[in-house]
Amino acid sequence: MDKKTSRLRRALRGRKKIQELGVNRLVVHRTPRHTYAQVISPDSQVLASASTAEKAVTEQLKYTGNVDAAKVVGKTVAERAIEKGVTVVAFDRSGFKYHGRVAALADAAREAGLKF
């Protein structure tokens, strides 16, 4: 089993648990160059999103693939979710370790007002 398949299997286990709870989830995806975050409802509707691929976010950054960029994405997605009335979410790390950019995004979202 390769590295990507292992990550996807971990992601499915976590998502199944979150779907049983029936709450909105904050989904994180990362690539070497970008970090993406979405708030998704239990019926699979995207309520808010932010990524380092967006011009509004990229203008604030020197480089898009680091911890500082993840903090900006976390803050932005939290602000957009709160505007839509979403304050409580479950954190879906998509099989990535809770470390580095993933942890930085989560901490920034918490500081901006999301509860999880």
UniProtKB/Swiss-Prot annotation:
Cellular compartments per GO CC: cytosolic large ribosomal subunit
Keyword Ribosomal protein set for record: yes
Keywords associated with the record: Ribonucleoprotein, Ribosomal protein, RNA-binding, rRNA-binding
Pfam families in UniProt: Ribosomal_L18p
Presence of keyword RNA-binding: yes
InterPro entries found in the cross-reference section: Ribosomal_uL18_bac-type (IPR004389), Ribosomal_uL18_bac/euk (IPR005484)
A single BP term in Gene Ontology: translation
Function text: This is one of the proteins that bind and probably mediate the attachment of the 5S RNA into the large ribosomal subunit, where it forms part of the central protuberance.
HAMAP family: Ribosomal_uL18_B
Assembly mode: Part of the 50S ribosomal subunit; part of the 5S rRNA/L5/L18/L25 subcomplex. Contacts the 5S and 23S rRNAs.
UniProt protein name: Large ribosomal subunit protein uL18
Organism the protein comes from: Shewanella woodyi (strain ATCC 51908 / MS32)
